[in-house]
């Protein structure tokens, strides 16, 4: 009898009875009058950069930006970009080079860069530099008033406010579509790009570039190499090596091993890579656990997939290398308040949080998913039998493993080697992942049919849409406006200091990180929360606690597929629905925030 094809979200048609609600939310948010707060933030983002550059050339060279020499203008632009990153100190400026300028889209040649570098190094002392940067920051945040703008500047501010309004409206549309599944999710990814083009927020060229960002290439390459592992049987050998020593290979022990291995590694290794490495192992465990008596156990499949994603998510805060969010908050703290947190010091404060979250997350995950199949001993026995039939490693398996090892080495070293000058160009982990996928074809490990049938291309497009959505929330200032509005509102109720401020900052960051990348989420909330903390708790340990807590909270992307790459990668297994993330994500969201508050109030306060 022919096995009936499994019905997934991709097989469903649009549900107009439900889809009308996201559409109405989008329309209402686009048509309401633009709030004044959006105009203020639009002024900061659209008029601010030009005004700041002009202010810097006046302060440093006593000329307007239009009359400044090329190297003087370059000096001001580098300082303005540094200011946006929260890097206010002279040392941060002197650490920049031509590669950094190119990455940040600042036109620079070696001659003008050397003139700018020498001027700052020799003519501007540390105190003078910091004073000028702080005055520029004050100008952008408080000195520019929408009501005082005229002509082109006012039109630019209005345009910026419209972009923020569109980003917020699209955000409501996307979240409702994801929660209700009223339209196939990859279609939502295309709706995001189309809405931004139709409303003038992004050009078609910008949208096309974002659809093929490095993160999207990484998702694609990861799913391709997972397909190669499954085809060759390497996943079976790795899986058996991991779990063969277990005396009682049941679901609870195996999921605990996943957490114990993945979560600590995620503090030092890319969570993208870990999710991609363990996905085929989780899928294999499920497929080999099925029997004639239990031909399908959806809860077991969901348990294994969610375990991999959650283990990746909780490990990131453990060390500065665990994510961009950690480095961003360290930079803000150093440049805004002169407080340095070293790598080891960060680990001693934040890695214990990871260790505490491992048993908590393991317990919640096993509580929310109750599989019929408890013992995976038959799966391990079947694995041994299949590997015995395979015999020794064949050519395809050796190539699959060798290419994978080279690819992982590239992921770990490409950034450092580029900075050291070993690699002449910055490759990015996405390019390396796709290069590995092509290497599998060149060596005859797979053919294109394998990729066509075994890679979930819908997930690739889904995450591409998520990249556009998150980047636009950040670049338009929509995330900053949302963060500022919430914190300003709650400050009216006495929540502008102490643990209440910490609770608001953590909660807001953890909401934003489910909608956008962790780095931009921390970058949006961090400066506002740190400034408020600096006013009410100057010179205290509260400031580094706020920085670390914001970074940790930005890892709480438990609730949506688009929240983090591991969530998207395990979704490609085909076993999960969007609501499955909420089953674990909602309790995890609240528990993680409570644990973080307790950590701050007890362990961090005790450490001082």
Spans of features found by a protein language model:
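Hydrophobic alpha-helical transmembrane segments of multi-pass integral membrane proteins
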Residues: 246-282, 492-536
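Transmembrane alpha-helix interface/packing and boundary motifs in multi-pass membrane proteins
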Residues: 174-183, 261-271, 309-320, 412-413, ...
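Juxtamembrane and boundary regions of transmembrane helices in multi-pass small-molecule transporters
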Residues: 2-66, 88, 92-96, 100-135, ...
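Structural signature of hydrophobic alpha-helical transmembrane segments
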Residues: 158-168, 187, 213-224, 272-275, ...
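Membrane-interface junctions of multi-pass transporters
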Residues: 184, 200-218, 226-240, 244, ...
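Core transmembrane alpha-helical segments of multi-pass membrane transporters/permeases
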Residues: 64, 68-87, 92-95, 99-136, ...
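Flexible hinge motifs at transmembrane-helix junctions and intramembrane kinks/re-entrant loops
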Residues: 35-36, 172-190, 207, 272, ...
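Interfacial loop-to-helix junctions that mark the boundaries of transmembrane helices
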Residues: 8-15, 44-45, 153-163, 178-180, ...
């Amino acid at each position: 009898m022919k096995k009936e094809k499994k019905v997934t979200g991709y097989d469903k048609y649009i549900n107009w009875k439900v889809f009308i609600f996201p559409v109405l939310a989008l329309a209402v948010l686009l048509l309401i009058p633009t709030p004044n707060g959006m105009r203020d933030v639009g002024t900061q983002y659209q008029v601010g950069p030009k005004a700041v550059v002009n202010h810097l050339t006046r302060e440093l060279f006593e000329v307007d930006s239009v009359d400044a020499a090329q190297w003087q203008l370059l000096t001001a632009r580098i300082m303005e970009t540094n200011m946006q990153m929260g890097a206010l100190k002279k040392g941060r400026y002197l650490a920049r080079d031509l590669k950094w300028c190119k990455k940040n889209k600042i036109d620079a040649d070696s001659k003008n860069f050397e003139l700018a570098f020498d001027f700052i190094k020799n003519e501007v002392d540390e105190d003078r530099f910091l004073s000028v940067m702080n005055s520029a920051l004050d100008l952008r945040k408080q000195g520019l008033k929408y009501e005082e703008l005229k002509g082109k500047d006012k039109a630019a501010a209005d345009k910026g406010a419209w972009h923020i309004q569109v980003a917020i409206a699209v955000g409501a549309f996307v979240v409702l579509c994801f929660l209700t599944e009223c339209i196939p999710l990859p279609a939502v990814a295309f709706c995001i790009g189309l809405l931004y083009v139709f409303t003038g927020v992004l050009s078609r060229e910008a949208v096309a570039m974002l659809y093929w960002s490095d993160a999207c290439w990484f998702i694609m390459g990861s799913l391709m190499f997972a397909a190669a592992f499954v085809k060759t049987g390497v996943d079976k050998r790795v899986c058996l090596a991991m779990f063969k020593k277990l005396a009682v290979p049941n679901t609870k022990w195996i999921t605990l091993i996943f957490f114990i291995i993945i979560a600590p590694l995620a503090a030092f290794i890319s969570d993208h890579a870990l999710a991609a490495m363990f996905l085929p192992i989780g899928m294999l465990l499920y497929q080999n656990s099925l029997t004639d008596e239990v031909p399908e156990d959806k809860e077991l499949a969901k348990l294994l997939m969610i375990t991999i994603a959650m283990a990746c998510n909780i490990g990131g805060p453990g060390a500065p290398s665990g994510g961009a969010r950690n480095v961003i908050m360290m930079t803000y703290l150093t440049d805004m308040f002169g407080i340095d947190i070293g790598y080891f010091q960060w680990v001693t404060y934040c890695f214990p949080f990871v260790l505490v979250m491992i048993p908590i997350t393991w317990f919640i995950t096993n509580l929310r998913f109750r599989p019929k199949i408890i013992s995976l001993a038959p799966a391990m026995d079947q694995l041994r039998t299949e590997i015995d039939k395979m015999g020794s490693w064949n050519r395809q398996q050796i190539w699959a493993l060798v290419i994978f090892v080279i690819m992982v080495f590239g992921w770990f070293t490409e950034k450092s080697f580029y900075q050291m000058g070993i690699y002449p160009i910055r490759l990015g982990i996405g390019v390396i992942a796709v290069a590995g996928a092509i290497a599998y074809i060149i060596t005859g490990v797979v053919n294109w049919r394998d990729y066509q049938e075994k890679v979930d291309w819908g997930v690739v497009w889904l995450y591409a849409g998520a990249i556009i959505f998150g980047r636009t929330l950040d670049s338009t200032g929509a995330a900053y406006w949302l963060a500022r509005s919430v914190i300003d509102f709650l400050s009216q109720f006495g929540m502008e200091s102490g643990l209440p401020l910490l609770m608001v900052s953590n909660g807001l960051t953890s909401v934003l990180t489910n909608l956008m990348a962790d780095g931009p989420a921390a970058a949006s909330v961090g400066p506002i929360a740190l400034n408020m903390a600096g006013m009410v708790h100057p010179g205290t340990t509260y400031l580094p606690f706020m920085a670390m807590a914001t970074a940790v909270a930005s890892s709480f992307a438990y609730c949506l597929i688009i929240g983090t790459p591991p969530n998207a990668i395990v979704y490609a297994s085909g076993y999960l629905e969007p609501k499955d993330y909420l089953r674990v994500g909602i309790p995890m969201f609240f528990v993680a925030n409570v644990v973080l508050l307790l950590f701050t109030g007890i362990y961090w306060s005790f450490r001082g």
